[in-house]
């Protein structure tokens, strides 16, 4: 019995799995990053010594594959998730509609200070996400008020900070 981990596009995975008799898991795709989020959930519980369902989780940053997986984890593990991002970079309408149907513990703020208030854990990622084809300077400027620094961290509930690296533009 074997498991294979592939970093392929979603549609290639779907096609590829039709030719296998063993399980295939999504390690990373443009739409999700479940293995990272599952390992983050384990890390959070190990450090905080509490089930994640008892913690307030915060995401500061762009809506991307990691956030989509964190949203799915929030529904699955029943934890509060506060998302802080500029309005233009909120999760897609499809994701927001799914959240409304599945969870009342996910909140979106266009103000980082409101998003981190009371957070036990703060997640972030690069501002320029996987396969982003954007004006980098402009996007970084749009996230200026969402910089995670000591001042923002002090507004949390003595939060731990998780970032997938490399760092520098979070």
Predicted features along the sequence, with ranges:
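Alpha-helical segments flanking ligand/cofactor-binding loops in enzyme cores
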Residues: 7, 71-72, 151
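Rossmann-like adenosine-cofactor binding region
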Residues: 100-170
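Phosphate/diphosphate ligand-binding glycine-rich loop within oxidoreductases
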Residues: 1-45, 168
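Short, charged/polar "capping" segments at the starts of alpha-helices
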Residues: 2-5, 88-94, 169-170
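Short, ordered loop/turn segments at secondary-structure junctions
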Residues: 29-30, 86-88, 127, 166
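General beta-strand structural signal in soluble alpha/beta enzymes
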Residues: 24-27, 33, 59, 108, ...
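A short helix->loop->beta-strand "cap" motif at the edges of active sites that frequently abuts
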Residues: 20-22, 79, 154-160
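Glycine-rich phosphate/diphosphate-binding loop of Rossmann-like nucleotide-binding domains
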Residues: 46-125
């Amino acid at each position: 019995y074997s498991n294979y981990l592939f970093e392929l596009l979603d549609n290639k995975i779907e096609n590829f799995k039709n030719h296998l008799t063993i399980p295939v898991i999504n390690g990373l795709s443009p739409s999700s990053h479940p293995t990272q989020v599952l390992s983050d959930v384990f890390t959070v519980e190990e450090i905080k010594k509490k089930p994640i369902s008892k913690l307030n989780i915060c995401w500061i940053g762009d809506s991307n594959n990691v956030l989509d997986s964190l949203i799915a984890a929030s529904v699955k593990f029943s934890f509060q998730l506060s998302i802080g991002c500029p309005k233009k970079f909120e999760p897609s309408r499809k994701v927001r509609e799914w959240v409304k149907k599945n969870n009342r513990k996910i909140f979106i703020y266009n103000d980082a200070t409101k998003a981190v208030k009371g957070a036990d854990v703060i997640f972030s990622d690069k501002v320029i996400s996987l396969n982003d084809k954007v004006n980098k300077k402009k996007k970084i400027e749009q996230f200026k008020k969402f910089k995670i620094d000591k001042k923002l961290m002090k507004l949390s509930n003595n939060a731990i900070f998780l970032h997938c690296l490399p760092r520098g533009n979070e």
